[in-house]
UniProtKB/Swiss-Prot annotation:
GO terms for molecular function: structural constituent of ribosome. This is Small ribosomal subunit protein bS21. The keyword Heme does not apply. It holds the Pfam family Ribosomal_S21. It comes from Acidithiobacillus ferrooxidans (strain ATCC 23270 / DSM 14882 / CIP 104768 / NCIMB 8455) (Ferrobacillus ferrooxidans (strain ATCC 23270)).
Length: 71
């Protein structure tokens, strides 16, 4: 859990903004959303495999666009 020490004479809003930023970097909200409901191991594997396929297609598209620009 991210912690933020409030500095002397620091406005609350600034400290809150720093805390929100540190939570975002730590991935707290995404982890909470992921754990909100139970996900079967097979569903998790399917989701991860689909994400991997999507990343691979995106990488291939970027690579092909890069090759097109070279010529």
């Amino acid at each position: 859990m991210p912690t933020v020490r409030v500095k002397e004479n620091e406005p609350f809003e600034v400290a809150l903004r720093r805390f929100k930023r540190s939570c975002e970097k730590a991935g707290v909200l995404t982890e909470v959303r992921r754990r909100e409901f139970y996900e079967k191991p097979t569903e998790e594997r399917k989701r991860k495999a689909a994400a991997a396929r999507k990343r691979a297609l995106k990488r291939m598209r970027r690579q092909s666009m890069r090759l097109v620009r070279l010529y």
